[in-house]
């Protein structure tokens, strides 16, 4: 069975509590439950991983390379805008990457408009709340089909 790794970056464990105007009131636990349901509907295995520690995220990405995951969906949170370490780790992957964000990063503060991950990703989905993850999983599923 194909496997997709969903990565949640810094501060995303605070979904449901942090800035509901941008992120809504759905918790990360609820988001991960939906992700599992959507993955089952799409016919692949999924693992969700969240950390607030950049080195742990890089290590999980390195492990994904060794595991030959079939696709990665990532919401790196604020790391999106400045973490060359996360970007360098992602560059190692052979699997397609889909970047997602709950809020529209291009309609927010200027510093959020730039993504150091975007150039590595097959595409970016943002601004659709929790549905950004659903759309990201659909994109990952389609990319897996195309690449196999």
UniProtKB/Swiss-Prot annotation:
Known function: Catalyzes a trans-dehydration via an enolate intermediate.
Principal EC category: lyase
Protein residues bound to substrate: 75, 81, 88, 102-103, 112
Database matches in InterPro entries: DHquinase_II (IPR001874), DHquinase_II_sf (IPR036441)
Swiss-Prot/TrEMBL site (Transition state stabilizer) positions: 18
Protein name: 3-dehydroquinate dehydratase
Similarity annotation: Belongs to the type-II 3-dehydroquinase family.
Top-rank taxon: Bacteria
Assembly and interaction partners: Homododecamer.
Keywords: Amino-acid biosynthesis, Aromatic amino acid biosynthesis, Lyase
GO molecular function: 3-dehydroquinate dehydratase activity
Pathway: Metabolic intermediate biosynthesis; chorismate biosynthesis; chorismate from D-erythrose 4-phosphate and phosphoenolpyruvate: step 3/7
Catalytic activity: 3-dehydroquinate = 3-dehydroshikimate + H2O
Cross-referenced PANTHER family: CATABOLIC 3-DEHYDROQUINASE
Entries under Pfam families matching the protein: DHquinase_II (PF01220)
GO biological process per UniProt: amino acid biosynthetic process; aromatic amino acid family biosynthetic process; chorismate biosynthetic process; quinate catabolic process
Active site, per annotation: 23, 101
Disulfide bonding pattern of the chain: none
SUPFAM superfamilies, per the entry: Type II 3-dehydroquinate dehydratase (SSF52304)
Keyword Amino-acid biosynthesis tagged: yes
